[in-house]
Amino acid sequence: MLILASASQSRKKLLENCQIEFIQISSNFDETTIQEKNIFNLALELSFQKANSLSENIQNISLPEEFNYGPLEILGCDSIFEFKGEAYGKPSNKEEAFIRWKKMSGEFGFLHTGHTLIIGHFDSTSKIFKITEIIKKTVSSRVYFSKLEDWEIKSYVDTNEPLYCAGGFALEGIGGKYIEKIEGCFSNVMGLSLPWLRENLYRS
């Protein structure tokens, strides 16, 4: 059984569309405690900490009965957009989102998603989660943006969508029409590489 250690609605929808049985529980890990400067490594470390935080507190969570038997997988993910060597998280306000889009217009950047899958067994009697394997990887996709006029950028920013997305855009949302092409894993840009998950899920 799979637990998605994330509050992300886009990751939730990806799993639902693939008909993967799971439950979603936010890990509530404080991301500001990680000081890693390498963007590629930062995405991976954050994904691990999210999954690990949930695994350490799983005894305090009320799980469905079917989660008490057999293997249990905890999936942590974190996405960071890299533009010319700079990490772009979620814009703090509309002004910042507009400035970023002015820079990204007609250019390309990289969406890095760190993935961590913690595999183990949960004993409902002892309330102990025994880890048997940890699988980690950062998957990167190159994203090309259309050349936009200022009014187009403003129109998009005014939807508020950029304020809730790593990099300030959502491929599966309104922002999708401003993306020319993607090199690499498509679903990775939405926060979860489905090919990576297929290769590693249920290995136990």
Swiss-Prot record:
GO molecular function, one term: nucleoside triphosphate diphosphatase activity
Cofactor(s) it depends on: a divalent metal cation
Subcellular location per the Swiss-Prot or TrEMBL entry: Cytoplasm
Catalytic activity entry: a ribonucleoside 5'-triphosphate + H2O = a ribonucleoside 5'-phosphate + diphosphate + H(+); a 2'-deoxyribonucleoside 5'-triphosphate + H2O = a 2'-deoxyribonucleoside 5'-phosphate + diphosphate + H(+)
InterPro entries: ITPase-like_fam (IPR029001), Maf-like (IPR003697)
The keyword Hydrolase belongs to this UniProt entry's keyword annotation: yes
Taxonomy, superkingdom: Bacteria
One family name in Pfam for this protein: Maf
UniProt-listed Enzyme Commission number(s): 3.6.1.9
Record's GO cellular component terms: cytoplasm
Catalytic residues of the enzyme: D78
Keywords: Cytoplasm, Hydrolase, Nucleotide metabolism
GO biological process terms on file: nucleotide metabolic process
Function summary: Nucleoside triphosphate pyrophosphatase. May have a dual role in cell division arrest and in preventing the incorporation of modified nucleotides into cellular nucleic acids.
Similarity section: Belongs to the Maf family.
This protein's name: Nucleoside triphosphate pyrophosphatase
Biological source species: Prochlorococcus marinus (strain MIT 9215)
